[in-house]
């Protein structure tokens, strides 16, 4: 059974509310700005963002508050593959701790389920305990380590979550 639909952008909603929608090419500058503010290393360039926005094997969600992108999540798929990958999730510094990451995570999980994926996997920096707590709270389990995975030598912790319950 699929999760309830994630509400997408609602122009009638109250000011200050967070809206979620799929990103478009019109979000390119805001995505690059969020990326540069959120990550010290391994930032995606405008060219990479454009390629992902145009790709059939990627889906990008943005969280919007008062017409401003305050969060984004990038999900990758492979044809006829039942495992999706959360490539990136970022929330603006002033918006962290307000549930934006959880909203974005719910959207990518729902999208992966709709595409028939059974598992969602991700890597997270070993020095990012806040993100690790979010993933663990949402049912992800750690299943591996990639030493020196990031450009600056930091390790990556590998997490995954079953999206479709096992049938007995």
Each predicted region: which residue ranges?
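Conserved beta-strand-loop-alpha-helix junction that forms the acyl-donor binding cleft
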Residues: 93-96, 122-132, 148-153
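Conserved catalytic-core motifs of GNAT/GCN5-like acyltransferases
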Residues: 2-7, 123, 136, 141-157
């Amino acid at each position: 059974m699929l999760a309830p639909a994630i509400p997408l952008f609602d122009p009638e909603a109250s000011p200050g509310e967070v809206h979620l929608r799929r990103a478009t090419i019109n979000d390119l500058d805001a995505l690059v700005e969020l990326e540069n503010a959120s990550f010290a290393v391994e930032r995606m360039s405008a060219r990479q963002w454009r390629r992902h926005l145009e790709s059939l094997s990627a889906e990008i969600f943005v969280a919007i508050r008062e017409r401003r992108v305050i969060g984004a999540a990038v999900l990758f798929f492979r044809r006829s593959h039942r495992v999706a990958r959360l490539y990136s999730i970022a929330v603006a510094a002033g918006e962290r701790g307000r549930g934006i990451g959880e909203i974005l995570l719910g959207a990518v999980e729902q999208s992966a389920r709709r595409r028939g994926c059974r598992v969602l996997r991700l890597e997270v920096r070993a020095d990012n305990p806040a993100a690790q707590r979010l993933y663990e709270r949402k049912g992800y389990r750690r299943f591996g380590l990639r030493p020196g995975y990031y450009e600056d030598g930091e390790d990556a912790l590998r997490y995954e979550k079953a999206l479709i319950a096992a049938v007995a």
